[in-house]
């Protein structure tokens, strides 16, 4: 398998529109409806793009700069919660955790009836004539110590999802040695595996394939990057 470099991959994901909002009616995308790329990155610090002032690190981020130049840059965006599940549920529903009732990673929002009548982000685009594709960590993923589960992925609004609706994340390569102190579920260290075995590479390569596939409708593509969540990679 030929590895597609992660920086080149990110550089290829430049489809955000900087145009004004389209006034759409359900099921009918506007004539100039843009393709929309939604990228979620876990545990990401405020590195770049360089258009942002006050970053604590001086890091060159040419691909983020390119995204900012060709897309929409929010300079005053904030996270509604400091943990994964309430934050991602808030983003995908458009509601504050005080409204969703999701305050912790263990809260199963899929079992909450209040979401039955809430329009989720991919549902909105699907109802307005978009092809909606998702892959990787979009909703909160891991439950307990099981890294091969769909987590809290909702199938609502997606035409397709990678790897599948039953497995939100590709199974990650992890060190084989377990901690000897009885806590945690993996040891610190490298895996000895090639980059193409890493879940994020699989997700990004899948996303590039979708971008290279001709679409007969505007595309909403959600790409969830799991790293740098883990400290060892």
List PLM regions with ranges.
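Formylglycine-dependent sulfatase
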Residues: 6-14, 19-233
